[in-house]
Amino acid sequence: MKMIETSLASASAALRDRVDEILAAATREDGCAPLSESFLNGLRRADDGHVHSCVMDSHDQVVGVAARDGDSAEVVVDPAFRRQGYGSFLIRHVVSQGVKNVWAHGDGAGAKAVAKALQLEQTRQLLVMAVEGDRLVESAQLQVPSGFRVLALNEAYESIPDIEQQWLRVNNEAFEWHPEQGGWDSARLAQARDTQWFRESDVLFLIDTAKRTVAGFHWTKRHGDLAEGADGEVYVVGLGSAYRRRGLGDLLIRMGLHHLEYEHARRVILYVEGDNESARRAYDALGFHVVESHVTYSPQSSS
């Protein structure tokens, strides 16, 4: 099979358009997007440093793409060209380049079959959970305890000059263990905010009014026009270490649900690790239920 390796951020418009066609076709076929947000950004941002391997058919038409970032990759094949070995070819290639985790969004039958054929094992599961209807309205009810107030980022700038530094502090306390979300600095935060969907009014902070410090935050996301039926998302929620074990985690979630429901969201989704049983129980109690599963497959470790 023929393949070209490039960065699509600097590739020709024709190649980028062809990849966009493949992504759209796969989304229609599978019911979920084949690439995550970070890998979608990597298609357009050269500074992200992603490498793209494009496999071609006998007529030199690109029919599949593997996006690679460090030891992680995501692979998509045009539905019209599946079950012809292109996906397996791309996965073998990225694994040969040091990739240890290949994402399968939706984890459909095709992905399971390829993983089995290549003797890859599931190493991580990321669930999408959703709440809608009456349960959303119920869980969006908000009572802020005495001594705290809720401010959106655009409001917080006026009363808390170092709000961004406090945001980073709480984020890094909350996600010290997390490979992607932890250890952020100002540049990483600026990069995360550099998206078309970012709104300062959608980042909510729980403020300890006596200390004028951030106790926690809830960064929400809109997947389009909420009034037109687009999903809202519990994007990132973080609680500072000094405020743990005080029952504030539930409040932080409700802050975002309250905001999104007020903004006319009909459904709110979130992502949670499949093995995080305590978080899943908390989300179950708020009416969330599993709607999608995303997994990573990895080469079997030798023992």
Curated annotation (Swiss-Prot):
Domain N-acetyltransferase intervals: 6-134, 154-303
Binding site for acetyl-CoA 2: 237-239, 244-250, 276-281
Molecular function terms, GO-annotated: mycothiol synthase activity; protein-N-terminal-alanine acetyltransferase activity
Gene3D superfamilies in the cross-refs: 3.40.630.30
Catalytic EC class: transferase
EC code: 2.3.1.189
Keywords from the named record: Acyltransferase, Repeat, Transferase
Positions with a binding annotation for 1D-myo-inositol 2-(L-cysteinylamino)-2-deoxy-alpha-D-glucopyranoside: 37, 180, 221, 233, 271
PROSITE patterns from the UniProt entry: GNAT
Residue positions binding acetyl-CoA 1: 75-77, 83-88
UniProt keyword Transcription, yes or no: no
Keyword Phosphoprotein applies: no
Reaction(s) catalysed by this chain's protein: 1D-myo-inositol 2-(L-cysteinylamino)-2-deoxy-alpha-D-glucopyranoside + acetyl-CoA = mycothiol + CoA + H(+)
InterPro entries the record matches: Acyl_CoA_acyltransferase, GNAT_dom, MshD_Acetyltransferase, Mycothiol_AcTrfase
Subunit (UniProt): Monomer.
Protein family: Belongs to the acetyltransferase family. MshD subfamily.
UniProt function note: Catalyzes the transfer of acetyl from acetyl-CoA to desacetylmycothiol (Cys-GlcN-Ins) to form mycothiol.
Protein name: Mycothiol acetyltransferase
Organism: Corynebacterium diphtheriae (strain ATCC 700971 / NCTC 13129 / Biotype gravis)
